[in-house]
Regions:
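An N-terminal, well-structured beta->alpha segment
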Residues: 5-101, 108, 190-191, 196-224, ...
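Gly/Ser/Thr-enriched, mixed-charge loops and adjacent short helices
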Residues: 32-41, 149-279, 285-287
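Conserved phosphate/anionic-ligand binding catalytic regions in large, soluble enzymes, centered on
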Residues: 37-57, 141-144, 228, 232-244, ...
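N-terminal small/polar loop signature for handling phosphorylated ligands or for N-terminal nucleophile
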Residues: 85-148, 249-306
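Short Gly/Thr/Asp-enriched flexible loops that form oxyanion-binding sites at enzyme active sites
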Residues: 97-105, 148-155, 303-323, 358
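Glycine-rich phosphate-binding loop plus the immediately following alpha-helix
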Residues: 154-184, 322-345, 350-361, 416
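Phosphate-binding and adjacent anionic-ligand microenvironments
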Residues: 288, 292-294, 315-317, 335-522, ...
């Protein structure tokens, strides 16, 4: 079957020369052909993501057209404006995929609002809402290596597509022949017919105004003298992040030169993920050189932001997503109470794998902290529930441990622009009172306890990898450990059982240990990985780290 499909592609006019060359190069390599054609990339609530290349199991113009036709078929049943917003980041073939998606939608009589320059995830979510679209499409693979690209789908609220909508789109994709099934007109024809229009400056300005309105202490940064190093990691963050920081009064910004402009090859950091040290390395070198107070880095689609803070001894320390989530929650709560801008019955939201330290901080400030499944769409869903009752202003902050933050209801996905703005404002505030982010973090630990949150990942590549991941999760369910490193398991929460959790079904297991530590195990939703999340609590960092290391050592053989 897969050989027949390979031969069909090989004999077709694939338009993209790269695809022809790749197929010709694997003509006698059965394993390579099987990898590309035995299965197809599956469309889910996060859309598609895969390696660039030829075949049904790769990202290419034909798979993008097929997916877009599936989205178009769904939209045509929805009424409304019959409009889709599209954006793209700096990844290879991003503009090509965005134009092809627009052309397929136009061929279906659907209007398109396309950004005329690469713009990040929050800009796509905002445009979807601004133009009252039926859907949004973001061409991105987030922080994956350069060989990846993806097709992220959004619903009319600017949140990732719901399970029901994604299932309908997937069904339509399966009915659409990948090479011949999608309707198509040229991009130029779509523009001439008035079906394809660019996103207007009014929308872009409205986004910046919405973000800047989320400042806790407006005008503070104009006099704080904050010195910043910033890296967009060759992605979309440069223009929007520097625009907002400049508007709020931060002018001493040094951009990492090798990572300033869009470059889908990511030559200076092969894995452009602000969660990891390697992605921040160039920025840290520059921060030390210029004596910056803070170093920021946003991932290619600018929905995540990582930082390194300057410590009193002049060294720099990376701040984890959990730590920054707690710091921002603490800063927003304290600041809004001080300024009299805290709404009545305020609500914050975090994912179930994020630090329980946030619960203690929220309780201290009288804030309701809601827990959601992993994936920012669930935080967006909580905002939508508030909005349905006209109470979206109750939402003050949401975060995930994977460096995603949102303050405000103007978009429904994580936003590294507002995250960068608030982190800089927070740093400027602590600087203005003779303190620092580092000092405030230590004060939080002194007040609530020394929590340590760490994530380990185990990769399972290829077709066999998915089977192995499924087998590991099944073993943990059917024969769960009764202890980890001598610590008894006192609770096991299986999120595959919504009747027990009160949340939608999810492939997540949480083991609670007798000393209060937790171990969370879940497959990644976007990559061939199983992730393990450890939360330990000690009298100091060394004690908490020792327990984490012991727990990780026991778990490691399960994933080998």
């Amino acid at each position: 079957m897969y050989l027949d499909e390979y031969k069909r592609w090989l004999s077709a006019n694939l338009i993209d020369f790269d695809l022809h060359a790749e197929l010709a190069s694997i003509e006698n390599d059965d394993e390579a052909i099987k990898e590309r054609f035995a299965v197809a990339l599956k469309f889910g609530t996060a859309g598609l993501r895969g390696t660039l290349g030829a075949g049904t199991n790769r990202m290419n113009i034909w798979v993008v057209r097929q997916a877009t036709q599936g989205v178009a078929d769904w939209i045509k049943t929805q009424g409304g404006t019959q409009t889709v917003a599209i954006s793209y980041d700096s990844r290879l073939k991003g503009w090509t995929f965005a134009k092809d998606a627009a052309a397929v939608l136009a061929a279906n009589g659907i209007h398109v609002r396309l950004y005329d320059e690469l713009m990040p995830v929050p800009a796509l979510s905002f445009a979807t809402r601004y133009y009252h679209c039926n859907a949004g499409i973001m061409i991105t693979a987030s922080h994956n290596p350069a060989k990846y690209n993806g097709f992220k789908a959004y619903g009319p609220d600017g949140c990732q597509m719901t399970d029901d909508a994604a299932a309908i789109v997937y069904d339509q994709i399966q009915k659409t022949d990948v090479l011949t099934g999608a309707k198509y007109i040229t991009f130029a024809e779509g523009v001439e017919k008035g079906l394809i229009q660019f996103v207007g400056d009014d929308c872009k300005e409205a986004l910046y105004q919405a973000i800047e309105s989320r400042q806790v202490r407006p005008n503070l940064c104009k006099t704080a003298g904050l010195k910043l190093v910033y890296s967009p990691l060759n992605g979309t963050g440069l223009v929007p992040v520097t625009r907002v920081l400049s508007d709020m009064g931060i002018t001493d910004i040094t951009i990492v030169p090798e990572q300033e402009y869009p470059n889908g090859y990511f030559t200076t950091c092969p894995y452009p993920n602000p969660e990891i040290y390697e992605a921040l390395e160039k920025g840290l070198e520059l921060a030390k050189k210029v004596g910056a107070d803070l170093m920021l880095a946003t991932d290619p689609d600018a929905d995540r932001v990582g930082i390194a803070m300057k410590c009193p001894d002049g060294s720099y320390e990376l701040v984890s997503g959990n730590e920054m989530g707690v710091l921002l929650l603490d800063y927003i709560c304290a600041g809004r109470i001080e300024k009299g801008t805290m709404p009545k019955n305020p609500v914050a939201v975090k994912s179930i794998v994020s630090t329980p330290l946030a619960d203690l901080v929220a309780k201290h400030y009288g804030v309701e902290l809601r827990h959601t499944l992993t994936g920012f769409k669930w935080i967006g869903d909580q905002i939508a529930q508030l909005e349905a009752h006209g109470e979206e202003e109750r939402f003050i902050f949401g975060f995930e441990e994977s460096y995603g933050y949102l303050a405000g209801s103007y978009v429904r996905d994580k936003d590294a622009i507002v995250g960068s703005m608030l982190i800089c404002e927070m740093a400027a505030y602590y600087r203005s009172i003779g303190s620092s982010i580092k000092q405030r973090l230590e004060e939080i630990y002194a007040q609530y306890g020394r929590f340590l949150n760490k994530v380990d990942s185990y990769e399972f590549d290829g077709l066999s990898g998915m089977d192995k991941m499924a087998g590991i999760m099944n073993t943990l369910r059917t024969n769960p450990p009764v202890e980890f490193a001598g610590r008894k398991v006192v609770s096991l929460t299986d999120y595959n059982k919504p009747e027990e959790t009160g949340l939608p079904k999810a492939n997540v297991l949480i083991f609670g240990l007798e000393d209060g530590a937790t171990v969370v195990v879940r497959p990644s939703g976007t990559e061939p990985k199983i992730k393990t999340y450890f939360t330990t609590l000690g009298k100091d960092l060394a004690e908490a780290q020792k327990e984490k290391d012991e727990l990780a050592a026991v778990l490691k053989p399960l994933f080998s």
